[in-house]
Regions:
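Polyanion-binding interface signature
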Residues: 11-136
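Long, solvent-exposed, polar/charged low-complexity segments
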Residues: 17, 142-170
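Contiguous mid-protein beta-loop-alpha structural module that forms a pocket-lining wall or clamp
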Residues: 1
Length: 170
């Protein structure tokens, strides 16, 4: 849109434009928090017998999912999460299995699980993948990313995880 058109809109809607500009980040945060609350509700309804699900609205890691039933003690060192690489902008969300910071474990001591969508590994992530490069708020509003679809993606990854036997390197 041309600058002249923006000026015209600004003049006609000064109060609304000013409020939007002043509250832009807070409104984005609220949209994202509501989205993840809905994702949590869906996941809890479907997975409550196997997983504990926590929300964290102030951090770059808005949702944390821990397996509560796995008999494999090695998996207790990791949890599933969504983590924003640009936390202040809620951009570049990664999903994957992150090491628990409270546990004395090295990711490099384990083989990377063969889980679709989680192709990478770092010193913090046992396995992770990037969902999209963009701002999640834009994906929610413009691309109509729904909590149901996002929860479905997470459930699909967790189903693969349940079948995987974590292998510790010698």
């Amino acid at each position: 849109m041309e600058t002249a058109k923006f000026v015209e809109i600004f003049k006609e809607n000064y109060t609304a434009v000013s409020e939007i500009a002043n509250n832009y980040q807070e409104v984005r945060k609220e949209i994202i928090n509501e989205f993840f609350k809905n994702v949590k509700d869906i996941l809890e309804n479907d997975l409550k017998d196997k997983y504990s699900i926590e929300l964290n609205s102030v951090a770059y890691r808005p949702i944390i999912i821990k397996n509560t039933t796995s008999q494999d003690k090695k998996w207790k060192n990791f949890y599933f999460t969504v983590e924003f690489q640009k936390s202040s902008m809620y951009s570049m969300p990664f999903v994957g299995f992150r090491k628990d910071d409270d546990k004395e474990v090295k990711v490099s001591d384990f083989d990377k699980p063969n889980i679709t969508q989680l192709e990478e590994q770092t010193k913090y992530f046992l396995a992770y993948g990037k969902l999209f490069d963009d701002d999640i708020c834009k994906n929610i509003i413009v691309d109509k990313l729904s909590p149901e679809d996002f929860a479905g993606t997470i459930k699909g990854i967790l189903e693969q995880f349940e079948k995987y036997n974590l292998v510790e390197r010698n």
